[in-house]
Amino acid sequence: MRNSGTPVNIIVGSHVWIEDSDVAWIDGLVEKINGQDVEVQATNGKKITAKLSKIYPKDMEAPAGGVDDMTKLSYLHEPGVLQNLKIRYELNEIYTYTGNILIAINPFQRLPHIYDAHMMQQYKGAPFGELSPHVFAVADVAYRAMINEGKSNSILVSGESGAGKTETTKMLMRYLAYLGGRAVTEGRTVEQQVLESNPVLEAFGNAKTVRNNNSSRFGKFVEIQFDKQGRISGAAVRTYLLERSRVCQISDPERNYHCFYLLCAAPQEELEKYKLGHPKTFHYLNQSKCFELVGISDAHDYIATRRAMDIVGMSEKEQEAIFRVVAAILHLGNVEFTKGKEVDSSVPKDDKSKFHLNTVAELLMCDVKALEDALCKRVMVTPEEVIKRSLDPQSALISRDGLAKTIYSRLFDWLVEKINVSIGQDATSRSLIGVLDIYGFESFKTNSFEQFCINFTNEKLQQHFNQHVFKMEQEEYTKEAIDWSYIEFVDNQDVLDLIEKKPGGIVALLDEACMFPKSTHETFANKLYQTFKTHKRFIKPKLSRTDFAVAHYAGEVQYQSDLFLDKNKDYVIPEHQDLLGASKCPFVVGLFPPLPEETSKSSKFSSIGSRFKLQLQQLMETLNSTEPHYIRCVKPNNLLKPAVFENVNIMQQLRCGGVLEAIRISCAGYPTRKPFFEFINRFGLLYPRALEGNYEEKAAAQKILDNIGLKGYQVGKTKVFLRAGQMAELDARRTMVLSAAAKKIQRRIRTHQAQRRFILLRKATISLQALCRGRLSSKIFDNLRRQAAAVKIQKNARRLHSRKSYKNLHVAALVVQTGLRAMAAHKQFRFRKQTKAATTIQAQFRCHRATLYFKKLKKGVILSQTRWRGKLARRELRQLKMASRETGALKEAKDMLEKKVEELTYRAQLEKRSRVDLEEEKNQEIKKLQSSLEEMRKKVDETNGLLVKEREAAKKAIEEAPPVVTETQVLVEDTQKIEALTEEVEGLKANLEQEKQRADDATRKFDEAQESSEDRKKKLEDTEKKAQQLQESVTRLEEKCNNLESENKVLRQQAVSIAPNKFLSGRSRSILQRGSESGHLSVDARPSLDLHSHSINRRDLSEVDDKPQKSLNEKQQENQELLIRCIVQHLGFQGKRPVTACIIYKCLLQWRSFEVERTSVFDRIIQTIGQAIETQDNNNILAYWLSNASTLLLLLQRTLKASGAAGMAPQRRRSSSATLFGRMTQSFRGTPQGVNLAMINGGVDTLRQVEAKYPALLFKQQLTAYVEKIYGMIRDNLKKEISPLLGLCIQAPRTSRASLVKGASRSVGNTAAQQALIAHWQGIVKSLTNFLNNLKSNHVPPFLVRKVFTQIFSFINVQLFNSLLLRRECCSFSNGEYVKAGLAELEHWCYNATDEYAGSSWDELKHIRQAIGFLVIHQKPKKTLDEISHELCPVLSIQQLYRISTMYWDDKYGTHSVSPDVIANMRVLMTEDSNNAVSNSFLLDDDSSIPFSVDDLSKSMERIEIGDVEPPPLIRENSGFSFLLPCSD
């Protein structure tokens, strides 16, 4: 493979892969090339020098999320494959195709969302490769091939232990059971029964090896059988190639089969019964020092195995016999021999050996002496006599081991046969799908006979695999019309010849050596050396004399031949057959049935190798008779932990699994296959003329290749096929073209930058010069201006100095004059001031005495008033606080509502009275305060008057006094009194201020209390309103409960004698069986309804029809016949009202059919509707009857009410509304009672409600079912019509590359291309428009139209969104733009349809709209998880966002998806969510339920006037229908 992938054109700057001992391959950049030596700068920082032939080119344009099919890789080589698997594994994409081979990497974590029922539904019938790789896709291909071609198929699951083979097998069988559709066999499906057999087969067929603690030591081929209809009819488990030698010989640190250790860990009574002990006491187990497995309890597994045996169908007696045989094998291994008395004879070695020999005979229920003779002697039959020959101890040991291996092999075969009988096989089945689960290639430090046989098996399977891969390659080349005659087939037949060729193969030489008693492993090895010394696949190690190596397809394996002869010997000894055939245990006898006569007469040599070869031949014959499919399971790490990818380990598994061999086969032909579109997009720049011309894609690709001069390529019908290395050459040339273009662009940019720099520099120079000249002129101007200013300053300064001298002289003269005049005035002023002061003192003293007396009196009055008001305010505050505490809570109990209302009313009255009292007290207090205020004002006025009089008297006294006032001697006593009075006045002022403050506080509290009282008053009024509403609700509920109870009792009594409509279809009945959560009907609530739904027959119906009814006479029967004949016709509509519904309703109301106990008119109407809608594809008829049925249902809903039962006391039960008729009639009382039945010609709302009997209620129920049925049929028809278009709308059709190139005809071409792009979307819009027009023309209620289109848009959302998440090619930028354009068409349709008919349909597309919005948004790496999940895509879950983010690829601009940090955060959130019980599926479910109830329909439809509806001509002239004629005004 390396040589075929060797690069032929690596240049400096190329990105390449180079080998690394730690991570297998590491990428780097070529820095230097010296001949065949290349110097590479690796990404880990190291510089590595390697040979040119040892490096591989790296595809830098590979998608960031990898490719789902590795044949799409530009470079199909080891590092490319490994890197692609690693990228996908990091994104939790565990499945990858290589052609039609599926590679499955064990995630070591639960991923339930990719295995649920939604995922199985998506892959059912999907073409292979259309959706993401999955094990379901392989199973679906196998199933479809079996059904279509009638040929059996097989699925080969391989991989080393721990790679997930068993889990993959489970998923395969689960999906096949899903497709096959077989229900249950004895309570368990076939798949379950097969899986339940696993613990038994693992206990007896699995063992610990060096690499795995639970390695299968046999191959398992599960056949799932199908009948002619494709349903599972049976299954069988075939086992192959059991490693029999392990029973007797094991190497350290391996273990023998699990069953031996399980039995040794059984309960004590079991151990005593079988005389067992610790495993180390038995020879067959103590050859290895490993007896227990870490973290595994053999005792627990023993119980689990016994339980599995019970499930499989093994009786207690059979289980006891099985473990008795297992114990016998352990004891048999402890029987040792020594030389006997005779020559070359042998006998049991000691008492211990005799004990074990006796125990074996006891357990097998055979004779001890016969057992000893069978082990130590041989019988030779000659024509003359029968000769008994003794065996030496070594031969006796070989005989013992042969017996042990034979017993164990027969026991294992019996177990498999028993399991097959339990599962049940179909002997008549001609088609089957087989699932092969077999051990993979093994290579250990010590490889013995077991590894030789296993690797021989894998060589055979690899040859089969190679042939299949080559066949697929041939089919691909033939399909594309490629010449492949010269391509060599990679085969491993030479290895198979080396092993199995007869004579002369290794197996034949081994059998030959085993036939000679004196042969040893040394002689056998020498024989091999001599025979195969020139064979290129056989290698003789230099440091060993007995080892040999074989160059297998997966690598060289060195075998140790020490135990080859012992492990290969498998004599068919008649003595053993006779011994166990004569056992007293029926189970043992069943293991050894009598042999054919010719076989029993001879002791023919048999070996395990030859048996192995025969079984392998049978397996290959089975596989060759089927069409194979391959699944290669890979274990990503030996730690068994998620998110750990060990490159070296996986690379070895890919080699061992043949994946790299398949790639080598592909590389022998044309490993690189590019569709024309991708090839032209990538390499069109190598020859632009091919793009400029209006060429087809194939012609353009051919011109590009011809211009390049590439050798060895071929152009197919849809792809370009390139030989190994040619892709690298094309990329190298492309890199050179891109480099030249980059250099040209850089040159242009540098020229442009230099030119810009020169222009900027020139502009700066000119600006600097202009600035300098301006500064110089400015300085000259400044000097001139300063000189003029200096002259002007000097002139002003001289003038100012002269003026200042004059002013100083003038001021000095004025100052002298002023001083003289002031002295004279000052003397006069001082004399007058002294005279006035004496007069003022005398006046103030007299005023002070009067004021003191007034203040003392005022203080006492104010103090007494203030304290009294404070006392009243505090008393009022206490009363308000007490009143506020008395407000209580309303009780919720229904029986206490009346008391609460009375109590609240009483409290309201008290509150009103208290408020009135408060207002009265407040008014009285205000009056008192006002009167006190008036008194105080009067007193103040009187005091003021006295003061005024005293002042006037004082003034007069002063004026009358003599002009010269003499100073009066003031006594000391008067001065002290004045001071005391002053202090008292100040104290009174302070007390007055305090009392004022208290009064203000009391006033403020009073205002607050008044506001609080107002709030409580408002709350009380609200409470009174609520109490009144609750009282009304209680009254209504009591009335409903009473009516429902009485109605239910009447209906139960009448239900026994009334038969329902026999014409109600099965679908209608199923529609009735819905839960009560949505308000729909449910027939599972009453057993009586089941009686009505299933017990009707024609005889009963005829009896009901023939029996004369009390409420109808013969004339009415004739009228009913005429009505039925009339409504069969298409009566059309009048004023948007369906005539049929209006006529039926009027007739039923006039005939009082709703109120009679028995009538057949309802059944006949329902029968007519059922017959009319039998043609489910005619949407016009369905819309017509949907309009009529919904209108009639509305009329019944607003007219009928359930009748009560006389003499029955109503009982209140909450559960009454949960019954069928409880829910059905709960809405009968929604309209107020009307006026009169005579007002039939008016609107529906003017009619009184009619008490309906059971037939009317049943009729309404059946009519409801038909409305829902017709609605579902219309919706499903529209879904069927648009489903094929949706599959085409999710991915943009590819356009010719020529249309993307500039040219004169580009606009015309683009217009046509745009029309072609949206053709599928326009088809959907056309279907929606036709359906809308059909519904509108039949006047279907807009409410139902909205519901239809809401569910249709939800269906579109689910289908497009699920397809987007399952197909990576759809998650591209350009495809997002395409779907966005299509969604715009749907939005435009919603706008044209208006909200009346489209409703919220556009909102139902929220998932696909947000997903598309994510695809087309720019700068995704800059978006944070919070922005994405809360702003851009708030509706999408983390699983859905993770799926889109990892599958996104930009085919237009080459941008990347969101940042790795966002991806890591999404993983953390998904891990946390995986612990919840909520499904982790990223797919959406389609809701096909009925999204409305009768109440919803009734509330949405407007009032219907039926009085002026003209009857049809058929009944217009009939006098019996005169009531249908409109009344004249």
Swiss-Prot record:
GO cellular component, one term: cytoplasm
Keywords for the protein's UniProt record, in alphabetical order: Actin-binding, ATP-binding, Calmodulin-binding, Coiled coil, Cytoplasm, Motor protein, Myosin, Nucleotide-binding, Repeat
SMART domains linked: DIL (SM01132), IQ (SM00015), MYSc (SM00242)
Bias (Basic and acidic residues): 993-1027
GO annotation, biological process: actin filament organization; actin filament-based movement; organelle localization; pollen tube growth
Stretches assigned to the Myosin N-terminal SH3-like domain: 11-60
Signal peptide range in chain numbering: none
Domain comment in the entry: IQ domain mediates interaction with calmodulin.
Protein name in the entry: Myosin-11
Gene designation: XI-E
